Amino acid sequence: MKKTRSTTLRRAWPSSDFSDRASDRMRSRSEKDYRLHKRFPAAFAPQASRGYMTSGDVSPISMSPISQSQFIPLGEILCLAISAMNSARKPVTQEALMEHLTTCFPGVPTPSQEILRHTLNTLVRERKIYPTPDGYFIVTPQTYFITPSLIRTNSKWYHLDERIPDRSQCTSPQPGTITPSASGCVRERTLPRNHCDSCHCCREDVHSTHAPTLQRKSAKDCKDPYCPPSLCQVPPTEKSKSTVNFSYKTETLSKPKDSEKQSKKFGLKLFRLSFKKDKTKQLANFSAQFPPEEWPLRDEDTPATIPREVEMEIIRRINPDLTVENVMRHTALMKKLEEEKAQRSKAGSSAHHSGRSKKSRTHRKSHGKSRSHSKTRVSKGDPSDGSHLDIPAEREYDFCDPLTRVPREGCFIIEHKGDNFIMHSNTNVLESHFPMTPEWDVSGELAKRRTEMPFPEPSRGSSHSKVHRSHSHTQDRRSRNERSNKAKERSRSMDNSKGPLGASSLGTPEDLAEGCSQDDQTPSQSYIDDSTLRPAQTVSLQRAHISSTSYKEVCIPEIVSGSKEPSSACSLLEPGKPPESLPSYGELNSCPTKTATDDYFQCNTSSETVLTAPSPLGKNKEDHDTLTLAEGVKKLSPSDRQVPHSSREPVGHKEESPKGPGGGPAASGGVAEGIANGRLVQHHGAEPSSLDKRKEIFSKDTLFKPLHSTLSVNSYHKSSLSLLKSHPKTPADTLPGRCEKLEPSLGTSAAQAMPASQRQQESGGNQEASFDYYNVSDDDDSEEGANKNTEEEKNREDVGTMQWLLEREKERDLQRKFEKNLTLLAPKETDSSSNQRATHSARLDSMDSSSITVDSGFNSPRTRESLASNTSSIVESNRRQNPALSPAHGGAGPAFNFRASAEPPTNEAEKLQKPSNCLQASVTSV
C-alpha cells in the first residue's frame, strides 16, 4: 500500500518526489515555493504546485549559505575526550578535560569551567559518563554488566567497585575490570571530587567490611555487614525500585552521610510497607536469594504445614495433659498393646475372628455407614477387624482402663472355679500398661488429626484412627443417631469393660450393646476374649436378651443355679471355652432379645439406677457377675432366675442363665417388671432405638463402668434389679432371694456393684441434671441422655416415684450386702483402676466418637477439643483428688469406694455423663 500510495502521490504531484514532499512539508511555504521556482520554469510552476496555493505566497527570498564546519555538541566532545583519556589511563578531571579539549580541538573555543561542569553533570544524568573519586569514566556497554550491584547505604548507592577506582576504570573496558555501576553516573556529581570524597569514604567503609568484588551487592544482596540489618532488609525491599530509580538519583551520592539515618528509616518503612503481607524477619545476613529461605513464607510453598513447635503448642493448649512424657508413654503403651494384640490374636483370634467378624459385620449393618466406615469405632463395640482380643489394640479405650489404656480384656481373666466365675486381674498386662496413661494417640496419628482429636482412641491403632477420622466426620454427619448410638455403645463398651471388672472389657460394651442390638441381627455373635471376660459379652447378650425379652426381667440377669450347664453365656464366661461354645447372638437373639434388648437398653435408660446399672454393667457385669457371681447366680434357684428369665430365656437364655454368666436372665421376668415400675419402662418398641438404648447403655455403662467392679455392679445390679424387678413381676422376696443367692457370689462384685448401682440410681435420679459431655458431644447422645432421663422418669412414673425410691433403697441395701460379700478375686485396685481407665477410655471414646467426631454444635472440632481437654483435665484432677482414681491407686479400696472416690469423678462424670446419670454413676464409681 505504501508503494501504491507513493506512486499515486507522485502522479498527483508530478512536480516533486515523494521524499522531497515529505521534507518540503517541514519547510516553510516560502522555502518550498522558492525551491519549486528554482527547479521548474515559471511556466510550469503553477501546474507543478497543484497541491499548493501559490497565489498568496511570499516571493522567493534570496538566501546566502553560511560556510561552517559540522557542529558537534559539547557533550559528545566531552564523551570522546573522556573515553580517550580513560583508554590512555589518564585520570579525567575537569582540569584535565579542559587541557585535553584545548589540545585535541585547537580551533574550537574551550568551554568555560561552569559550562564544562554543567555539561558533565548532564552527561552523568544521561548515564553516558559516571563520576568516581578518580575522575570521570565513560559508560561502556560492559559498564552496567560488569559493575557489582549497588549498595544502598544511608540512602546512597555506592559502587563497591568504585572503591578501587583503578579497577573500576572501565572507560576502555578492561577485561576483569569492574566498572562502577551506572548508578554513579546516575548520581550526577557536580563536584566529582566532593562526590568522590563522600563516595570514597563510604566505599572505604564498605570495603573494610568486605572485598569489593566478592561481595556482589545487589539491592537484595545487601549482605554487606556494613548495611545494618534494617538496611539489609530495606535494600531487598527497594531492590527493584532502587535499581530502577537509582539512575535518577544522581544527586544521592553527593549527599553527606548525615542523611544515612533518615534513609535507613525510610528504607525500613518502605520495606515494611512492601512486606506487610509477608512475615518479615529482620536478618543480619542475606544469602543471594532474597526472601531468605529462613523466612517463614509458608503461604507460598506449603500453606497447610504448621511448624512442629506451633503444632505442639496448639496441642498443649487443647490438651494440657499432653506432654512429651505422656506421648512417649503412650507410644510405648501402644507398642506393647500391639504386641499383646498380636499375641492374643495368635492365641484366640481364629475363633474370635470368625464370631467377631460376623458380629462386626452385623454391627456395621445395624450401625450403617458411620460405624461400618469407621472400623475403629466398629472395633469398639464389635471389633470388625478381628477378635476382641485384637480389640484392645483397636480400641484400647473400650478394653483398657482409662488411666492405663490397658486392654481390659488383657487386664482381667475369668476363671471358672466350681460354680463361681472368678475374675483375676491380669496383673502383667495391667502392670505393663499401667504406667502408660497417655490420653492421646500420637502413635500414627497425623499432627492435624492430633490437633482435631487430642484424645484419639489409641487402641484402635493409627490406621484405625485414620480410617475413623477420615470417615468419622462424614459418617457422623450422615448418621448422628448411629454415631451417638455408637458413641454410647463405646461408652457402654468402656463402661461394660469397666463395669464387669475393667476386665469385663471382654464383652466390649459395643459387643454387649451389639449383642443386644444384634440379638436381632446375627446369631452366634458372642465373643470370648481369651484372657478377657468375653464370655461376659454373652452374659451381656443374655442380659441384653433378658432385657430384650423383658427388660424388666432382663435387668436382673439372674443365673439359674439349677442349670449350671454352661449356657452360651456360661461358655462365654468360661475362660477356656471358645467363642463358638458361647451361645451365638442368634441364640440370644432367638430369645425375645429384640424386645428384651430394647427393654434392656430401655431398662438401662429408664431404670438407670438399677436397670441401667445391670444393663450396661449388667451386660459386662452380669458377665462378670456371671463370672464372679456365676456361683451366686448359680446359687440362685434356676427356677427363680429362669422364671424371670423365661421370657427371654426362651432362646438359650436359660442356658446362659443356668450358668453364672447366664445369671443375667435369672430374675429378668420379675425384675423386669420391677424395673418397669421404677425406670425400666420397657422400651420394647425401641428396637430401632436399640442403638439408642445402647447409647444409653453406654452412657449408663460409662456410669456403671466407673463402678469399680462392674461385676459387683452386675451382681448388685442383678440383685438390685431383682429387687426392682421383684416389684413389677417377681415378688421382692423372690428377687431378694435371688439377690441373696447372688450376693454370696455377687457379694464381691455386687459389693462394688451396689455402690455403683446406688450411684447409678442416684445418677439415674440426677441423670436429667447431669449431662455426659462425651455422649452429649453427639447431639443424639444428649438427646439420648434426655430420652434416658425421660424414659427413666416414665418408668419411675409407671412404677411410682416412691416405688422407684424404694427400689433404689433396695438396690443400695443389696449393694451394701454385696459390698460386704464382695470377694472379687481380681484386685479391687486393679478393678478400680481398670474401671477408672475404662471410664476414662469410655469418656474418651464417647468423646472421640461423639463429641470429637461431630463437627457442629457440641460436636464442633473446637468444642470436641475443648471437651476432650476438659475431660482429660477433669479426669486428671479427679485422679489427683481421688487417689482411688489414680492408676497407682488401682482401686486399692473396694471398687465401690466409688462413693468416696467416685464423687470427684462424679463431677467429671457429670460433665462427661450429664446425658445419663448412669454415666455419672459410673464415673462416680470410678
From Swiss-Prot:
Encoding gene, per UniProt annotation: STOX2
GO annotation, cellular component aspect: cytoplasm; nucleus
Positions of the UniProt region annotated as Disordered: 1-32, 338-391, 452-529, 564-588, 632-672, 724-803, 825-926
Species whose genome carries this gene: Homo sapiens (Human)
Chain coiled-coil ranges: none
Extent of Polar residues compositional bias: 518-529, 746-769, 847-884, 914-926
One of the protein's GO biological processes: maternal placenta development
Superkingdom to which the source organism belongs: Eukaryota
Biased composition (Basic and acidic residues): 18-32, 379-391, 473-495, 632-658, 785-799
Listed name of the protein: Storkhead-box protein 2
Biased composition (Basic residues): 353-378, 463-472
GO MF annotations in UniProt: DNA-binding transcription factor activity; RNA polymerase II transcription regulatory region sequence-specific DNA binding
